[in-house]
């Protein structure tokens, strides 16, 4: 939890003590109600199990709600990868904990360096899709291009995750029509109505915070308008399943939905915890958000944003708006970039060191 974050960051960042190790700041883990604590443990266990990770050093203070034994049990239920534990209150304080954690991490990095790269079929790929800082070009170009890429992943036998439940509101009926069966159909309506209910319970309306000021400045006027653009990221494939926040997503599942908030770092965290190896993230206004574990490919449909934020954006879908390329061509180009990224090519967010992450709470935010 947050009291133990310094040890992880010291292990990874100060003087670059362990090349190849990453950490993340966990704001949760203590003083949480049971559902929130479950979210926290699901995210941490999912991170440890993600295919991009070789092994995990779990650091705790020792007195938090998310006790070490609970976290370790959650991780071991998902994976048998190397796992070490450090409890600050039991090893002699922060400096001693850093020393021990660094030693464990260096041992894991040495072991991981002995592994050989292997080829895997596209059917093993799990791609998470996200949008943030949207403007009208997101719904017109960037998200349709992501949707075309998503359809290609599904056609190859892989898995694509559509997220951000708050941005299904007003378009949930369109998604529900694509459900593979009644159970999935009903779950789509369930998660959207539950999301709105979280706000009604405290006397709020989800539309008071969504669209955001940036969305409105870009030209989006209503939540329904934003939702109609958001769901384009799911392409045209049937929807095969609806997963709860941060739960393990099986490979070769086709198009699935994960119940996440619209908050970008918290939504991306859930998909990575679910097993996504790569995130594809559209932003009409421009966003620097990355992730410590999974590379984030940034897409914009706005050529002005692409020029203004070239340091942050990997792929421009604006040619669709100007009739220079078809959505199918852009989908193929984007899939090629995703494959290159999965093979090790750095994204702009990785190169700049953006590693934002957050964990949702049971009373969801916009």
Question: PLM ranges: what are they?
Answer:
Residues 1-8, 13:
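Single conserved hydrophobic/aromatic residue that forms the stacking wall/gate
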Residues 3, 89-92, 96, 133, ...:
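Short coil/turn segments at secondary-structure junctions
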Residues 10, 15-16, 25-26, 51, ...:
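Anaerobic metallocofactor- and corrinoid-dependent redox/one-carbon enzyme cores
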Residues 10, 14-23, 28-115, 124-126, ...:
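Alpha/propeptide regions of enzymes that mature by internal proteolysis
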